[in-house]
């Protein structure tokens, strides 16, 4: 049985990934600061803390894994005006997305089987911008750069790719206008991201790439009335 570790496995996207992989027959472990669903083994872990990551891997006890999904991070992209932001606030966001991915990847590399895969969860905010999202955008942009570098460093034994989701929601509280903004005709769902993870886990000739999963939003020109 193939083994997968998903960080941030208790969140909206992480839960979808864990459930999809478990349904496909994977043995899945969720590393998160809180417990998630029963689809995965639950390992409490703060990915920004070096000792917590080491303890999580020791607790899990897996000597070999096939897939690492670096999905953990503070979901709220808006951080307020940069001129008013404290260093602690900046570090909190960047550490949760980027430093956490470094710490977990470092721990996972010796355990990844040949032919294994790493999938980093980036964001369309790394390639297009909104006001007051600087720490989030910087962290996600860093994840894309980390993906490129790791693909070269770890290949050909390990493949490394990233997914850049756009608007992903559980479907509640959305109206026709929300869906109509997307050329695909709808807002994305966690299952869309999970399908992309499954694809990248099996795509043997794909590495160092960023899969933009946004319903076409980054290709659409939007003009305000």
Where are these regions (language model features)?
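Active-site helix of classical SDR
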Residues: 105, 139, 147
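C-terminal substrate-recognition "lid" of short-chain dehydrogenase/reductases
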Residues: 111, 186-213, 218
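Conserved Rossmann-fold SDR core element
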Residues: 144, 154-168, 206-213
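Substrate-binding pocket helix/loop in short-chain dehydrogenase/reductase
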Residues: 79-82, 86-91, 178
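Canonical Rossmann dinucleotide-binding motif of NAD(H)/NADP(H)-dependent dehydrogenases/reductases
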Residues: 1-27
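Alpha-helical segment proximal to the catalytic Tyr-Lys
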Residues: 110, 151-156
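Residue(s) in the substrate-gating loop at a strand-loop-helix junction
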Residues: 123
């Amino acid at each position: 049985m193939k083994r997968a570790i998903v960080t941030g496995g208790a969140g909206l996207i992480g839960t979808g990934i864990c459930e999809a992989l478990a349904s496909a027959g994977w043995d899945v472990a969720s590393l998160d600061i809180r417990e998630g669903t029963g689809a995965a083994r639950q390992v409490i872990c703060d990915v920004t803390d070096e000792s917590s990551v080491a303890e999580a891997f020791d607790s899990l006890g897996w000597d070999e894994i096939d897939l690492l999904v670096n999905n953990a991070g503070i979901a709220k992209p808006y951080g307020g005006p940069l001129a008013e932001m404290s260093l602690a606030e900046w570090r909190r966001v960047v550490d949760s997305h980027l430093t956490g991915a470094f710490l977990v990847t470092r721990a996972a590399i010796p355990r990844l089987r040949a032919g294994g895969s790493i999938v980093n969860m980036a964001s369309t905010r790394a390639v297009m911008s909104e006001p007051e999202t600087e720490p989030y955008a910087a962290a996600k942009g860093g994840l894309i750069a980390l993906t490129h570098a790791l693909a070269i460093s770890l290949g050909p034994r390990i493949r490394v790719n990233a997914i850049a989701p756009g608007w992903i929601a559980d479907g509640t509280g959305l109206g026709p206008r929300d869906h109509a903004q997307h050329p695909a005709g709808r807002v994305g769902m966690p299952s869309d991201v999970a399908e992309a993870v499954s694809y990248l886990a099996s795509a043997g000739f794909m590495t160092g790439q960023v899969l933009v999963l946004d319903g076409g939003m980054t290709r659409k020109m939007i003009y305000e009335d």
